[in-house]
């Protein structure tokens, strides 16, 4: 649950919630010298799970719930590596990635991979931050 500490309290999942959510997710954990550095996971937008705000029900799309690097390892390029790994993995089965990104590094990271930033969601889940939806078309076919 180390990653939950990186989130605003309103966005944190309990261990039970996270276990249940990850059952239907594609998940990648990143390690450096055996130490956990980052995690990313996404859930298909096929309607089996709740569809996040602004996303379509589309079996060819996936929602990237999180790409998180632990604070100690931030600003070392790990986020870009992990996001690239996620895109590579999901490109086998999906044509588009959706997500909601925080202002700053998260939006820049996704935009850097070619994501189109869309609607702003003010005060996302009471965090005090304005998140933007993004979508990234995967050119794999």
Language model regions located:
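Conserved acyl-donor/pantetheine-binding loop and adjacent beta-alpha core of acyl/acetyltransferases
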Residues: 39-66, 74, 124-128
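Conserved acetyl-CoA-binding loop-helix of GNAT-fold acetyltransferases
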Residues: 69, 75-88
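Active-site rim helix/loop that mediates acceptor-substrate recognition in acyltransferases
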Residues: 5-33, 47
